[in-house]
């Protein structure tokens, strides 16, 4: 996160001018001019489409989009992208069904789904999404060791409050995925998604780190050994690199143990091993005492823009289709939560073709932001 996440605001602000043109013009052709036969479309839906989209237009499984009351010109455009192979990867061979329909059949079945009433929400989700609040809830299992706010009270445990969120995510993923070995950490993290880890990291990063008074008479005796450390971690243990942890004010036992583990190759990090390989135990202990005695500083991380503010920008295009059929953008309210996440992720990662959405979604660095937008819209009443 850090610098990457701080760029988030810049990217979003630069994208605002693009929002006015975020849908493509309808393709010319005869398909849109064909008459719609709702009864014929219903019969086609029963035979070809209901297995996935239901007769009521609700996806029968997670990640299948709801089609009921969707804008018919958008449905037509989407079906054409499948027919032209632009979305083959998102549904595999499933949408080859659309290729087997005649133009009049396709027009009618899409007209049928567009004519259906909006669907009611099945879930009881709130449209409100707060990175901090969600991170606080998800971090409950961390509190026993790291403290409820990330200020630990146990010896040998790192303080997470005020730490760079990008580093917290990186370290948590290493424990979750097993590249760092600690069974207790792996057990607590194994079920957490990337978005979950980001929310937890944001929560801890925004909490104020508490200083602990040093009990050592001369804590600065170790500064002479920290010249190489300072290049990455800062001269006083506060790093400007968001991927590198702050050491200032960390627990002395934790620092002592981890620095030795890098020196002894118990943790894999070539550069750290190279720097530490010649240091003796007592020298590392002095380094740990020095950094532990420094006052911790809070990361300069800027929180992501609130989801409600981002949704207002999305609405500039995705609400206008109700009154302007030329805007080929889908309705998002009440849409399937997982489908929205996967669709936005595909646009962000370049796996779906839409130049406008690529530009807009490229600003969504965080999976948590995508999850938040999906939560916002899926919880709203369909229209």
Predicted feature descriptions by range:
Residues 2-8:
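Positively charged n-region of N-terminal signal peptides that target proteins for export
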Residues 18-21:
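C-terminal motif of bacterial Sec signal peptides marking the signal peptidase cleavage site
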Residues 23-45, 60-63, 114-139, 153-156, ...:
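Electrostatic cytochrome c docking/interface patches
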Residues 42, 57-84, 132, 150-176, ...:
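Gly/Gly-Pro-rich "capping" loops immediately C-terminal to redox-active cysteine motifs
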Residues 49-55, 109, 113, 139-149, ...:
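The canonical Cys-X-X-Cys-His
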Residues 97-122, 190-212, 277-300, 347, ...:
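C-terminal capping alpha-helices of c-type cytochrome domains
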Residues 144-146, 159, 164-167, 195-199, ...:
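Extended non-catalytic domains of envelope/secretory-pathway proteins
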Residues 254, 266, 281-284, 294, ...:
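C-terminal functional regions that serve as terminal interaction/effector modules
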């Amino acid at each position: 996160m850090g610098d990457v996440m701080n760029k988030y605001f810049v990217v979003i602000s630069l994208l605002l001018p693009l929002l006015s043109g975020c849908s493509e013009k309808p393709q010319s052709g005869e398909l849109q001019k064909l008459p719609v036969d709702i009864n014929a479309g219903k019969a086609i839906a029963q035979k070809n489409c209901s297995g996935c989209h239901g007769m009521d237009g609700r996806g029968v499984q997670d990640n299948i989009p709801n089609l009921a009351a969707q804008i018919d010109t958008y449905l037509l455009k989407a079906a054409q992208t499948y027919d032209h192979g632009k979305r083959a990867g998102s549904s595999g061979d499933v949408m080859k069904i659309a290729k087997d329909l005649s133009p009049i059949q396709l027009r009618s079945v899409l007209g049928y789904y567009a004519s259906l009433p909006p669907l009611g929400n099945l879930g009881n989700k709130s449209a409100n999404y707060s990175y901090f609040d969600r991170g606080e809830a998800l971090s409950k299992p961390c509190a026993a060791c790291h403290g409820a706010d990330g200020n630990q009270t146990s010896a040998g445990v790192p303080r997470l409050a005020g730490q760079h969120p990008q580093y917290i995510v990186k370290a948590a993923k290493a424990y979750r995925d097993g590249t760092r070995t600690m069974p207790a950490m792996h057990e607590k993290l194994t079920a957490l998604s990337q978005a979950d880890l980001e929310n937890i990291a944001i929560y801890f990063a925004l909490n104020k780190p508490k200083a602990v008074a040093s009990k050592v008479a001369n804590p600065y005796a170790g500064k002479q050994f920290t010249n190489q450390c300072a290049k990455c971690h800062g001269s006083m243990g506060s790093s400007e690199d968001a991927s590198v942890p702050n050491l200032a004010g960390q627990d002395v036992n934790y620092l002592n143990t981890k620095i030795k583990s890098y020196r002894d190759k118990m943790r894999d990090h070539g550069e750290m091993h190279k720097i530490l390989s010649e240091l003796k135990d007592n020298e590392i202990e002095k380094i740990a005492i020095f950094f532990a005695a420094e006052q911790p500083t809070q990361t300069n991380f800027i929180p992501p823009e609130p989801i409600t503010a981002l949704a207002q920008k999305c609405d500039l295009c995705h609400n206008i289709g109700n009154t302007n059929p030329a805007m080929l953008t889908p309705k998002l309210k009440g849409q399937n939560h997982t489908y929205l996440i996967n669709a936005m992720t595909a646009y962000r990662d370049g796996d779906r073709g839409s130049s406008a959405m690529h530009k807009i979604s490229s600003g969504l660095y965080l999976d948590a932001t995508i999850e938040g937008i999906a939560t916002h819209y899926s919880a709203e009443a369909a229209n």
